[in-house]
Curated annotation (Swiss-Prot):
Keywords: Aminoacyl-tRNA synthetase, ATP-binding, Cytoplasm, Ligase, Nucleotide-binding, Protein biosynthesis. Its EC number is 6.1.1.17. The lineage of its organism: Archaea, Methanobacteriati, Methanobacteriota, Stenosarchaea group, Halobacteria. It is found in: Cytoplasm. GO terms for biological process: amide biosynthetic process; glutamyl-tRNA aminoacylation. One of its GO terms (molecular function) is glutamate-tRNA ligase activity. It comes from the Archaea. It comes from Haloquadratum walsbyi (strain DSM 16790 / HBSQ001). Disulfide bonds: none annotated. Its main location: cytoplasm. SUPFAM superfamilies: Nucleotidylyl transferase (SSF52374), Ribosomal protein L25-like (SSF50715). This is Glutamate--tRNA ligase.
Amino acid sequence: MTIDDELRDRIKRSAKKHALLNAVKHKSDAEVGAIMGPLMGENPEFRPHGDAIPGIVSGVVSQINDLSVDERRSRLETIAPEALTDIESEDTTDTYDLPSLPGVSDDEPTQSVRMRAAPNPNGPWHIGHARMPAVIGTYSNRYDGSFIIRFDDTDPETKRPDLDAYDDILEDVAYLGFEPDDVIRASDRLELYYARARELIDAGGAYTCSCSGEHFSKLKNAGEACPHREKSVNQTQTEFEAMIHGEYSAGEMVLRVRTDIEHKNPALRDWVAFRLIDTPHPRPQAADYRCWPMLDFQSGIDDHETGVTHIIRGIDLQDSAKRQRFVYDYFDWEYPEVVHWGHINVDEYDVSLSTSTLIEKIETGELDGWDDPRAPTLQSLRRRGIKGDAIVEAMINLGTSTTNVELSMSSIYSNNRQHIDAKADRYFFVRNGETFTLETASEDTIAGHPPLHPDNPERGERVVPVTDGITIEPADVPADGDRVWLKGYACVRRDDNHFRTTNDGIEVVREGDVDVIHWAPAPESSASISVRMRTPDGDITGIAEPDLTDAEIDDIVQFERVGFARIDTKDEQSLDTDMTVYWTHP
Protein backbone atom coordinates (compact mmCIF):
# COMPACT_ATOMS: atom_id res chain seq x y z
CA MET A 1 0.00 0.00 0.00
CA THR A 2 1.48 3.32 -1.14
CA ILE A 3 2.02 6.16 1.34
CA ASP A 4 1.04 9.49 -0.19
CA ASP A 5 2.75 12.77 0.67
CA GLU A 6 0.03 13.89 3.09
CA LEU A 7 0.20 10.68 5.11
CA ARG A 8 3.99 10.77 5.09
CA ASP A 9 3.92 14.29 6.58
CA ARG A 10 1.51 13.18 9.31
CA ILE A 11 3.76 10.25 10.18
CA LYS A 12 6.76 12.55 10.40
CA ARG A 13 4.97 15.07 12.62
CA SER A 14 3.79 12.42 15.03
CA ALA A 15 7.17 10.69 15.02
CA LYS A 16 8.86 14.00 15.81
CA LYS A 17 6.70 14.50 18.88
CA HIS A 18 7.24 11.00 20.19
CA ALA A 19 10.98 11.09 19.46
CA LEU A 20 11.30 14.35 21.40
CA LEU A 21 9.23 12.92 24.25
CA ASN A 22 11.41 9.82 24.39
CA ALA A 23 14.68 11.78 24.28
CA VAL A 24 13.69 14.43 26.83
CA LYS A 25 12.07 12.03 29.29
CA HIS A 26 14.98 9.60 29.35
CA LYS A 27 17.70 12.24 28.86
CA SER A 28 19.22 10.21 26.05
CA ASP A 29 18.96 9.66 22.32
CA ALA A 30 15.58 8.55 21.03
CA GLU A 31 15.20 5.02 19.70
CA VAL A 32 12.98 3.89 16.84
CA GLY A 33 11.84 0.78 18.67
CA ALA A 34 10.88 2.74 21.78
CA ILE A 35 8.54 5.12 19.97
CA MET A 36 6.85 2.74 17.53
CA GLY A 37 4.37 1.51 20.16
CA PRO A 38 3.17 4.96 21.29
CA LEU A 39 3.15 6.19 17.69
CA MET A 40 0.96 3.36 16.38
CA GLY A 41 -1.24 3.39 19.48
CA GLU A 42 -2.01 7.08 19.02
CA ASN A 43 -2.50 6.70 15.26
CA PRO A 44 -4.20 3.37 14.48
CA GLU A 45 -4.69 4.49 10.89
CA PHE A 46 -0.93 4.07 10.41
CA ARG A 47 -1.07 0.31 11.05
CA PRO A 48 -1.82 -0.84 7.47
CA HIS A 49 1.52 0.76 6.53
CA GLY A 50 3.47 -0.94 9.34
CA ASP A 51 6.29 -2.23 7.14
CA ALA A 52 7.10 1.18 5.70
CA ILE A 53 6.73 3.35 8.80
CA PRO A 54 10.01 2.40 10.59
CA GLY A 55 11.97 3.71 7.62
CA ILE A 56 10.22 7.09 7.84
CA VAL A 57 10.53 7.22 11.63
CA SER A 58 14.23 6.37 11.50
CA GLY A 59 15.00 9.53 9.55
CA VAL A 60 13.08 11.66 12.04
CA VAL A 61 14.83 10.04 15.00
CA SER A 62 18.23 10.72 13.45
CA GLN A 63 17.34 14.41 13.12
CA ILE A 64 16.20 14.61 16.76
CA ASN A 65 19.32 12.87 18.01
CA ASP A 66 21.47 15.45 16.23
CA LEU A 67 19.96 18.20 18.42
CA SER A 68 21.42 19.35 21.71
CA VAL A 69 19.58 18.65 24.97
CA ASP A 70 18.36 22.26 25.17
CA GLU A 71 17.17 22.22 21.55
CA ARG A 72 15.18 19.04 22.15
CA ARG A 73 13.45 20.56 25.16
CA SER A 74 12.73 23.80 23.32
CA ARG A 75 11.16 22.04 20.34
CA LEU A 76 9.06 19.78 22.57
CA GLU A 77 7.85 22.86 24.43
CA THR A 78 6.75 24.35 21.11
CA ILE A 79 4.87 21.36 19.67
CA ALA A 80 3.65 19.62 22.86
CA PRO A 81 3.89 21.95 25.89
CA GLU A 82 1.48 19.83 27.95
CA ALA A 83 3.65 16.75 27.47
CA LEU A 84 6.74 18.67 28.60
CA THR A 85 4.90 19.90 31.69
CA ASP A 86 3.90 16.33 32.53
CA ILE A 87 7.49 15.14 32.26
CA GLU A 88 8.89 17.93 34.40
CA SER A 89 6.19 17.58 37.04
CA GLU A 90 6.94 13.91 37.57
CA ASP A 91 8.52 13.02 40.90
CA THR A 92 12.24 13.47 40.43
CA THR A 93 13.19 12.06 43.83
CA ASP A 94 15.63 9.18 43.50
CA THR A 95 13.96 5.82 43.97
CA TYR A 96 15.90 2.69 44.68
CA ASP A 97 15.20 -0.98 44.23
CA LEU A 98 17.38 -1.69 47.26
CA PRO A 99 16.32 -0.59 50.75
CA SER A 100 18.40 2.01 52.56
CA LEU A 101 21.31 0.64 54.54
CA PRO A 102 20.81 0.65 58.32
CA GLY A 103 21.92 3.90 59.91
CA VAL A 104 22.47 5.69 56.60
CA SER A 105 20.30 8.46 55.19
CA ASP A 106 19.81 8.61 51.44
CA ASP A 107 19.38 12.37 51.61
CA GLU A 108 22.43 13.22 53.70
CA PRO A 109 24.64 10.24 54.51
CA THR A 110 26.19 10.81 57.93
CA GLN A 111 28.93 8.22 57.59
CA SER A 112 31.23 6.89 54.93
CA VAL A 113 29.88 3.54 53.75
CA ARG A 114 32.50 0.84 53.34
CA MET A 115 31.48 -2.68 52.32
CA ARG A 116 33.22 -5.85 51.26
CA ALA A 117 32.72 -8.93 49.16
CA ALA A 118 34.77 -11.77 50.64
CA PRO A 119 35.04 -14.65 48.18
CA ASN A 120 36.85 -17.91 48.71
CA PRO A 121 39.16 -18.10 45.67
CA ASN A 122 38.61 -21.78 44.92
CA GLY A 123 37.35 -21.14 41.39
CA PRO A 124 35.67 -18.59 39.10
CA TRP A 125 32.23 -17.37 40.11
CA HIS A 126 28.94 -19.04 39.34
CA ILE A 127 25.85 -16.92 38.70
CA GLY A 128 24.81 -16.84 42.35
CA HIS A 129 28.12 -15.26 43.33
CA ALA A 130 27.21 -12.17 41.27
CA ARG A 131 24.59 -11.10 43.80
CA MET A 132 27.06 -9.86 46.42
CA PRO A 133 29.21 -7.58 44.20
CA ALA A 134 26.09 -6.40 42.34
CA VAL A 135 24.44 -5.23 45.56
CA ILE A 136 27.58 -3.98 47.30
CA GLY A 137 28.78 -2.16 44.18
CA THR A 138 25.37 -0.55 43.78
CA TYR A 139 25.29 0.57 47.41
CA SER A 140 28.83 1.91 47.07
CA ASN A 141 27.82 4.00 44.06
CA ARG A 142 24.62 5.14 45.76
CA TYR A 143 26.39 6.40 48.89
CA ASP A 144 29.70 7.34 47.25
CA GLY A 145 31.27 4.71 49.47
CA SER A 146 34.04 2.13 49.17
CA PHE A 147 33.93 -1.40 47.78
CA ILE A 148 36.49 -3.93 49.02
CA ILE A 149 37.29 -7.32 47.55
CA ARG A 150 38.81 -9.46 50.29
CA PHE A 151 39.91 -12.97 49.44
CA ASP A 152 39.22 -15.13 52.48
CA ASP A 153 41.90 -17.69 51.63
CA THR A 154 42.94 -18.94 55.07
CA ASP A 155 42.03 -22.60 54.58
CA PRO A 156 44.74 -24.19 52.40
CA GLU A 157 43.32 -27.68 52.87
CA THR A 158 39.52 -28.02 52.96
CA LYS A 159 38.78 -24.94 50.84
CA ARG A 160 42.08 -24.85 49.01
CA PRO A 161 42.55 -21.73 46.89
CA ASP A 162 43.05 -21.96 43.14
CA LEU A 163 45.86 -19.61 42.10
CA ASP A 164 44.06 -18.69 38.88
CA ALA A 165 40.84 -17.86 40.73
CA TYR A 166 42.15 -14.61 42.23
CA ASP A 167 42.42 -12.99 38.80
CA ASP A 168 39.36 -14.83 37.49
CA ILE A 169 37.20 -13.34 40.24
CA LEU A 170 38.56 -9.83 39.69
CA GLU A 171 37.73 -10.24 35.99
CA ASP A 172 34.21 -11.31 36.97
CA VAL A 173 33.85 -8.18 39.12
CA ALA A 174 35.01 -6.00 36.21
CA TYR A 175 32.58 -7.81 33.90
CA LEU A 176 29.76 -6.82 36.25
CA GLY A 177 30.85 -3.20 35.89
CA PHE A 178 32.61 -2.55 39.20
CA GLU A 179 36.15 -1.66 40.20
CA PRO A 180 37.04 -2.39 43.83
CA ASP A 181 38.67 0.37 45.83
CA ASP A 182 40.86 -2.17 47.64
CA VAL A 183 41.85 -5.77 46.99
CA ILE A 184 43.01 -7.74 50.03
CA ARG A 185 44.31 -11.29 50.37
CA ALA A 186 43.85 -12.63 53.88
CA SER A 187 46.81 -14.99 53.40
CA ASP A 188 49.03 -11.88 53.31
CA ARG A 189 47.88 -10.86 56.78
CA LEU A 190 48.81 -13.75 59.08
CA GLU A 191 51.11 -11.60 61.22
CA LEU A 192 48.22 -9.19 61.86
CA TYR A 193 45.98 -12.04 62.99
CA TYR A 194 48.73 -13.36 65.27
CA ALA A 195 49.17 -9.91 66.81
CA ARG A 196 45.45 -9.58 67.52
CA ALA A 197 45.37 -13.10 68.95
CA ARG A 198 48.18 -12.21 71.36
CA GLU A 199 46.20 -9.16 72.48
CA LEU A 200 43.12 -11.30 72.94
CA ILE A 201 45.09 -13.77 75.08
CA ASP A 202 46.42 -10.90 77.21
CA ALA A 203 42.84 -9.72 77.72
CA GLY A 204 41.85 -13.15 78.98
CA GLY A 205 39.78 -13.78 75.87
CA ALA A 206 41.45 -16.92 74.53
CA TYR A 207 43.17 -20.11 75.64
CA THR A 208 45.01 -22.99 74.00
CA CYS A 209 43.30 -26.36 74.05
CA SER A 210 44.58 -29.85 73.20
CA CYS A 211 41.27 -31.68 73.65
CA SER A 212 40.24 -33.88 70.76
CA GLY A 213 37.39 -32.47 68.74
CA GLU A 214 35.10 -35.28 69.85
CA HIS A 215 35.91 -34.84 73.55
CA PHE A 216 35.48 -31.07 73.48
CA SER A 217 32.18 -31.43 71.63
CA LYS A 218 30.80 -33.62 74.41
CA LEU A 219 31.88 -31.10 77.07
CA LYS A 220 30.54 -28.17 75.08
CA ASN A 221 27.16 -29.76 74.46
CA ALA A 222 26.91 -30.49 78.19
CA GLY A 223 27.81 -26.89 79.04
CA GLU A 224 30.96 -28.01 80.83
CA ALA A 225 34.30 -26.21 80.68
CA CYS A 226 37.36 -28.00 79.38
CA PRO A 227 40.25 -28.09 81.91
CA HIS A 228 42.45 -26.05 79.56
CA ARG A 229 40.11 -23.10 80.05
CA GLU A 230 41.86 -22.34 83.35
CA LYS A 231 45.34 -22.02 81.83
CA SER A 232 47.30 -18.91 82.72
CA VAL A 233 47.86 -16.16 80.20
CA ASN A 234 51.58 -16.94 80.18
CA GLN A 235 51.04 -20.62 79.41
CA THR A 236 48.54 -19.78 76.70
CA GLN A 237 50.95 -17.27 75.13
CA THR A 238 53.78 -19.80 75.22
CA GLU A 239 51.69 -22.53 73.61
CA PHE A 240 50.28 -20.17 71.00
CA GLU A 241 53.81 -19.15 69.98
CA ALA A 242 54.64 -22.84 69.72
CA MET A 243 51.65 -23.24 67.38
CA ILE A 244 52.96 -20.40 65.22
CA HIS A 245 56.44 -21.92 65.06
CA GLY A 246 55.17 -25.35 64.05
CA GLU A 247 55.97 -27.21 67.26
CA TYR A 248 52.64 -29.05 67.16
CA SER A 249 51.08 -31.23 64.48
CA ALA A 250 47.71 -30.65 62.88
CA GLY A 251 44.92 -31.47 65.33
CA GLU A 252 47.20 -31.39 68.37
CA MET A 253 46.44 -27.87 69.58
CA VAL A 254 43.94 -25.07 68.89
CA LEU A 255 43.34 -21.57 70.23
CA ARG A 256 39.79 -21.00 71.49
CA VAL A 257 37.91 -17.79 72.17
CA ARG A 258 36.62 -17.75 75.75
CA THR A 259 32.88 -17.04 75.49
CA ASP A 260 30.06 -18.36 77.69
CA ILE A 261 30.40 -22.11 78.12
CA GLU A 262 26.75 -22.26 79.20
CA HIS A 263 25.43 -20.14 76.35
CA LYS A 264 22.02 -21.31 75.15
CA ASN A 265 23.47 -21.74 71.65
CA PRO A 266 26.18 -24.45 71.80
CA ALA A 267 27.67 -23.16 68.52
CA LEU A 268 28.82 -20.03 70.36
CA ARG A 269 30.56 -21.83 73.22
CA ASP A 270 34.36 -21.34 73.21
CA TRP A 271 34.78 -21.54 69.45
CA VAL A 272 38.08 -22.21 67.67
CA ALA A 273 40.01 -19.14 66.51
CA PHE A 274 43.22 -20.83 65.24
CA ARG A 275 44.10 -24.36 64.19
CA LEU A 276 47.10 -26.10 62.64
CA ILE A 277 47.17 -27.24 59.00
CA ASP A 278 50.13 -29.17 57.63
CA THR A 279 49.14 -28.67 53.97
CA PRO A 280 51.14 -25.72 52.54
CA HIS A 281 49.22 -22.80 51.09
CA PRO A 282 49.45 -22.68 47.26
CA ARG A 283 50.59 -19.04 47.32
CA PRO A 284 54.39 -18.92 47.79
CA GLN A 285 54.00 -15.88 50.06
CA ALA A 286 51.99 -17.96 52.54
CA ALA A 287 53.41 -21.44 52.00
CA ASP A 288 55.52 -21.48 55.20
CA TYR A 289 52.62 -20.81 57.59
CA ARG A 290 51.02 -23.68 59.50
CA CYS A 291 48.93 -21.85 62.11
CA TRP A 292 45.80 -20.56 60.38
CA PRO A 293 42.87 -18.51 61.69
CA MET A 294 39.34 -19.80 61.36
CA LEU A 295 37.13 -17.72 59.08
CA ASP A 296 35.11 -16.14 61.89
CA PHE A 297 38.26 -14.82 63.59
CA GLN A 298 40.00 -13.70 60.40
CA SER A 299 36.90 -12.08 58.94
CA GLY A 300 36.01 -10.30 62.17
CA ILE A 301 39.51 -8.85 62.54
CA ASP A 302 39.64 -7.78 58.89
CA ASP A 303 36.24 -6.09 59.00
CA HIS A 304 37.47 -3.90 61.86
CA GLU A 305 40.95 -3.27 60.47
CA THR A 306 39.63 -2.25 57.04
CA GLY A 307 36.86 -0.03 58.39
CA VAL A 308 33.91 -2.05 57.10
CA THR A 309 30.68 -0.31 58.12
CA HIS A 310 28.07 -2.70 56.71
CA ILE A 311 28.15 -6.46 56.15
CA ILE A 312 25.79 -8.45 53.94
CA ARG A 313 25.77 -12.18 54.59
CA GLY A 314 23.48 -15.19 54.26
CA ILE A 315 20.74 -15.81 56.77
CA ASP A 316 22.47 -19.11 57.63
CA LEU A 317 25.52 -17.18 58.90
CA GLN A 318 23.80 -15.36 61.75
CA ASP A 319 25.98 -17.23 64.25
CA SER A 320 29.10 -15.71 62.67
CA ALA A 321 28.16 -12.24 63.86
CA LYS A 322 27.37 -13.59 67.32
CA ARG A 323 30.76 -15.32 67.58
CA GLN A 324 32.63 -12.28 66.36
CA ARG A 325 30.87 -9.99 68.83
CA PHE A 326 32.66 -11.79 71.67
CA VAL A 327 36.00 -10.73 70.15
CA TYR A 328 34.72 -7.21 69.49
CA ASP A 329 33.59 -6.92 73.11
CA TYR A 330 37.03 -7.92 74.39
CA PHE A 331 38.58 -5.18 72.25
CA ASP A 332 35.76 -2.69 72.88
CA TRP A 333 35.15 -2.36 69.14
CA GLU A 334 31.89 -1.34 67.50
CA TYR A 335 30.46 -4.12 65.35
CA PRO A 336 29.42 -3.21 61.77
CA GLU A 337 25.77 -3.08 60.75
CA VAL A 338 24.63 -6.44 59.35
CA VAL A 339 22.06 -7.23 56.66
CA HIS A 340 21.11 -10.90 56.34
CA TRP A 341 19.54 -12.26 53.19
CA GLY A 342 18.14 -15.55 51.98
CA HIS A 343 19.68 -17.97 49.53
CA ILE A 344 19.41 -17.52 45.78
CA ASN A 345 18.22 -20.27 43.46
CA VAL A 346 18.66 -20.04 39.69
CA ASP A 347 16.38 -21.79 37.23
CA GLU A 348 17.20 -23.28 33.82
CA TYR A 349 20.38 -25.19 34.70
CA ASP A 350 20.83 -28.91 35.33
CA VAL A 351 24.20 -28.24 37.01
CA SER A 352 24.08 -27.05 40.62
CA LEU A 353 25.49 -23.71 41.75
CA SER A 354 28.44 -25.35 43.46
CA THR A 355 32.06 -24.56 42.69
CA SER A 356 33.18 -28.01 43.82
CA THR A 357 30.57 -29.67 41.58
CA LEU A 358 31.65 -27.57 38.61
CA ILE A 359 35.32 -28.42 39.23
CA GLU A 360 34.44 -32.12 39.28
CA LYS A 361 32.47 -31.92 36.02
CA ILE A 362 35.30 -30.03 34.31
CA GLU A 363 37.89 -32.54 35.52
CA THR A 364 35.80 -35.49 34.28
CA GLY A 365 35.16 -33.83 30.90
CA GLU A 366 31.41 -33.38 31.35
CA LEU A 367 32.00 -29.66 30.87
CA ASP A 368 34.60 -28.20 28.51
CA GLY A 369 35.61 -25.51 30.99
CA TRP A 370 34.30 -22.67 33.13
CA ASP A 371 32.94 -20.91 30.03
CA ASP A 372 31.08 -23.95 28.67
CA PRO A 373 27.57 -22.67 27.77
CA ARG A 374 26.11 -25.47 29.90
CA ALA A 375 27.88 -24.15 33.01
CA PRO A 376 26.02 -21.68 35.29
CA THR A 377 29.06 -19.40 35.54
CA LEU A 378 29.76 -15.75 34.82
CA GLN A 379 32.48 -16.78 32.38
CA SER A 380 29.86 -18.75 30.46
CA LEU A 381 27.39 -15.85 30.38
CA ARG A 382 30.13 -13.49 29.23
CA ARG A 383 31.11 -15.81 26.38
CA ARG A 384 27.48 -16.10 25.38
CA GLY A 385 27.26 -12.33 24.95
CA ILE A 386 25.29 -11.39 28.07
CA LYS A 387 26.24 -7.97 29.41
CA GLY A 388 27.28 -7.62 33.03
CA ASP A 389 24.77 -4.81 33.51
CA ALA A 390 21.94 -7.19 32.67
CA ILE A 391 23.02 -9.51 35.48
CA VAL A 392 23.42 -6.66 37.98
CA GLU A 393 19.95 -5.33 37.20
CA ALA A 394 18.42 -8.75 37.80
CA MET A 395 20.29 -9.17 41.08
CA ILE A 396 19.22 -5.74 42.32
CA ASN A 397 15.59 -6.61 41.62
CA LEU A 398 15.88 -9.54 44.04
CA GLY A 399 16.39 -7.10 46.91
CA THR A 400 17.85 -8.11 50.27
CA SER A 401 15.00 -10.08 51.84
CA THR A 402 15.73 -12.75 54.44
CA THR A 403 13.57 -15.18 52.47
CA ASN A 404 15.07 -17.38 49.77
CA VAL A 405 14.67 -15.96 46.26
CA GLU A 406 14.37 -17.47 42.80
CA LEU A 407 16.33 -15.85 39.99
CA SER A 408 14.75 -16.51 36.62
CA MET A 409 17.25 -16.43 33.78
CA SER A 410 14.48 -14.87 31.69
CA SER A 411 14.90 -11.69 33.75
CA ILE A 412 18.58 -11.53 32.81
CA TYR A 413 17.66 -12.22 29.18
CA SER A 414 15.04 -9.48 29.20
CA ASN A 415 17.51 -6.97 30.63
CA ASN A 416 20.19 -8.01 28.15
CA ARG A 417 17.81 -7.65 25.23
CA GLN A 418 17.45 -3.97 26.11
CA HIS A 419 21.23 -3.58 25.89
CA ILE A 420 21.87 -5.45 22.63
CA ASP A 421 18.74 -5.32 20.47
CA ALA A 422 19.41 -1.95 18.84
CA LYS A 423 22.97 -2.89 17.87
CA ALA A 424 22.48 -6.51 16.80
CA ASP A 425 22.32 -6.99 13.03
CA ARG A 426 19.80 -9.58 11.82
CA TYR A 427 20.61 -12.75 9.89
CA PHE A 428 18.95 -16.04 8.96
CA PHE A 429 20.09 -19.33 10.51
CA VAL A 430 18.32 -22.61 9.74
CA ARG A 431 18.65 -25.65 12.00
CA ASN A 432 18.24 -29.19 10.64
CA GLY A 433 16.80 -27.71 7.48
CA GLU A 434 14.96 -29.33 4.59
CA THR A 435 16.13 -28.35 1.12
CA PHE A 436 13.95 -27.20 -1.79
CA THR A 437 14.61 -25.78 -5.21
CA LEU A 438 13.02 -22.42 -5.96
CA GLU A 439 11.70 -21.30 -9.31
CA THR A 440 12.08 -17.53 -9.60
CA ALA A 441 9.81 -15.30 -11.61
CA SER A 442 12.61 -13.27 -13.18
CA GLU A 443 16.29 -12.39 -12.89
CA ASP A 444 15.25 -9.58 -10.55
CA THR A 445 14.26 -12.16 -7.92
CA ILE A 446 17.43 -14.25 -7.66
CA ALA A 447 18.04 -13.08 -4.10
CA GLY A 448 16.22 -11.86 -1.03
CA HIS A 449 17.05 -8.45 0.43
CA PRO A 450 16.03 -8.34 4.09
CA PRO A 451 17.26 -5.35 6.15
CA LEU A 452 20.24 -5.67 8.45
CA HIS A 453 18.08 -4.13 11.16
CA PRO A 454 14.35 -3.40 10.85
CA ASP A 455 14.59 -0.22 12.94
CA ASN A 456 17.68 1.09 11.19
CA PRO A 457 17.20 0.94 7.42
CA GLU A 458 20.25 3.14 6.92
CA ARG A 459 22.42 0.12 7.75
CA GLY A 460 21.42 -1.40 4.43
CA GLU A 461 20.22 -4.78 3.25
CA ARG A 462 21.58 -8.30 3.13
CA VAL A 463 21.74 -10.36 -0.05
CA VAL A 464 20.49 -13.94 0.31
CA PRO A 465 20.72 -15.91 -2.99
CA VAL A 466 18.01 -18.39 -3.97
CA THR A 467 19.28 -19.69 -7.32
CA ASP A 468 20.85 -22.88 -5.89
CA GLY A 469 17.88 -23.72 -3.71
CA ILE A 470 16.90 -22.88 -0.17
CA THR A 471 16.69 -24.61 3.20
CA ILE A 472 13.98 -24.07 5.80
CA GLU A 473 13.33 -25.52 9.25
CA PRO A 474 11.13 -28.65 9.39
CA ALA A 475 8.47 -26.92 11.49
CA ASP A 476 8.11 -24.25 8.80
CA VAL A 477 7.66 -26.58 5.82
CA PRO A 478 4.14 -25.97 4.43
CA ALA A 479 1.86 -28.69 3.17
CA ASP A 480 2.08 -29.38 -0.54
CA GLY A 481 0.19 -26.61 -2.36
CA ASP A 482 0.29 -24.16 0.57
CA ARG A 483 2.05 -20.81 0.63
CA VAL A 484 4.62 -19.21 2.93
CA TRP A 485 6.31 -15.82 2.84
CA LEU A 486 10.09 -16.06 2.70
CA LYS A 487 11.09 -13.11 4.83
CA GLY A 488 12.83 -10.43 2.81
CA TYR A 489 11.99 -12.17 -0.46
CA ALA A 490 8.46 -13.02 -1.59
CA CYS A 491 5.46 -15.29 -1.28
CA VAL A 492 6.06 -18.82 -2.56
CA ARG A 493 3.91 -21.90 -3.00
CA ARG A 494 5.13 -25.44 -2.40
CA ASP A 495 4.97 -27.95 -5.24
CA ASP A 496 6.43 -31.22 -3.95
CA ASN A 497 10.19 -30.54 -3.52
CA HIS A 498 10.00 -27.17 -5.22
CA PHE A 499 8.80 -23.68 -4.43
CA ARG A 500 7.44 -21.24 -6.98
CA THR A 501 6.96 -17.53 -6.44
CA THR A 502 3.41 -16.19 -6.53
CA ASN A 503 2.07 -12.76 -7.35
CA ASP A 504 0.75 -12.18 -3.82
CA GLY A 505 1.55 -8.93 -2.07
CA ILE A 506 2.34 -8.34 1.60
CA GLU A 507 -1.38 -7.97 2.37
CA VAL A 508 -1.68 -11.79 2.50
CA VAL A 509 0.60 -11.67 5.53
CA ARG A 510 -1.26 -8.78 7.17
CA GLU A 511 -4.55 -10.59 6.70
CA GLY A 512 -3.13 -13.69 8.38
CA ASP A 513 -3.41 -15.95 5.36
CA VAL A 514 0.32 -16.66 5.00
CA ASP A 515 3.02 -17.28 7.61
CA VAL A 516 6.38 -15.48 7.44
CA ILE A 517 9.40 -17.76 7.83
CA HIS A 518 13.17 -17.40 7.76
CA TRP A 519 15.33 -19.36 5.36
CA ALA A 520 18.86 -19.73 4.02
CA PRO A 521 20.64 -20.87 0.87
CA ALA A 522 20.70 -24.64 0.42
CA PRO A 523 23.66 -26.39 2.13
CA GLU A 524 25.08 -27.36 -1.27
CA SER A 525 25.11 -23.72 -2.37
CA SER A 526 28.43 -21.89 -2.46
CA ALA A 527 26.61 -19.05 -0.70
CA SER A 528 25.73 -21.07 2.41
CA ILE A 529 27.63 -20.76 5.68
CA SER A 530 27.87 -23.76 7.99
CA VAL A 531 27.49 -22.76 11.63
CA ARG A 532 27.93 -24.55 14.94
CA MET A 533 25.87 -22.96 17.70
CA ARG A 534 26.85 -23.79 21.27
CA THR A 535 23.88 -23.65 23.67
CA PRO A 536 23.11 -24.60 27.30
CA ASP A 537 21.31 -27.66 25.89
CA GLY A 538 24.18 -28.80 23.68
CA ASP A 539 25.59 -27.98 20.26
CA ILE A 540 23.41 -27.30 17.21
CA THR A 541 24.56 -27.17 13.59
CA GLY A 542 22.87 -25.36 10.77
CA ILE A 543 23.13 -23.16 7.71
CA ALA A 544 23.31 -19.36 7.67
CA GLU A 545 23.15 -16.77 4.93
CA PRO A 546 26.43 -15.58 3.35
CA ASP A 547 26.43 -12.05 4.77
CA LEU A 548 26.98 -13.49 8.26
CA THR A 549 30.67 -13.56 7.34
CA ASP A 550 30.61 -9.74 7.59
CA ALA A 551 30.09 -10.03 11.35
CA GLU A 552 33.24 -9.76 13.43
CA ILE A 553 34.31 -11.96 16.32
CA ASP A 554 32.58 -10.80 19.54
CA ASP A 555 29.73 -9.20 17.57
CA ILE A 556 26.28 -10.07 18.86
CA VAL A 557 23.77 -10.80 16.11
CA GLN A 558 20.16 -11.88 16.05
CA PHE A 559 19.23 -14.99 14.12
CA GLU A 560 15.66 -14.10 13.21
CA ARG A 561 13.06 -16.36 14.85
CA VAL A 562 15.88 -18.24 16.65
CA GLY A 563 17.57 -15.86 19.06
CA PHE A 564 20.63 -13.75 19.70
CA ALA A 565 24.14 -15.17 19.42
CA ARG A 566 27.72 -14.03 19.89
CA ILE A 567 30.25 -14.68 17.11
CA ASP A 568 33.00 -16.74 18.72
CA THR A 569 35.27 -18.07 15.96
CA LYS A 570 35.40 -18.08 12.17
CA ASP A 571 36.89 -20.39 9.52
CA GLU A 572 36.97 -23.43 11.80
CA GLN A 573 38.13 -26.00 9.26
CA SER A 574 39.10 -28.45 12.02
CA LEU A 575 35.43 -28.67 13.03
CA ASP A 576 34.19 -28.80 9.44
CA THR A 577 32.20 -25.61 9.98
CA ASP A 578 32.68 -22.07 8.78
CA MET A 579 31.82 -20.43 12.08
CA THR A 580 31.09 -21.11 15.75
CA VAL A 581 28.65 -18.94 17.67
CA TYR A 582 27.42 -19.02 21.25
CA TRP A 583 23.68 -18.77 21.84
CA THR A 584 22.85 -15.72 23.95
CA HIS A 585 19.12 -15.99 24.59
CA PRO A 586 15.79 -15.78 22.73
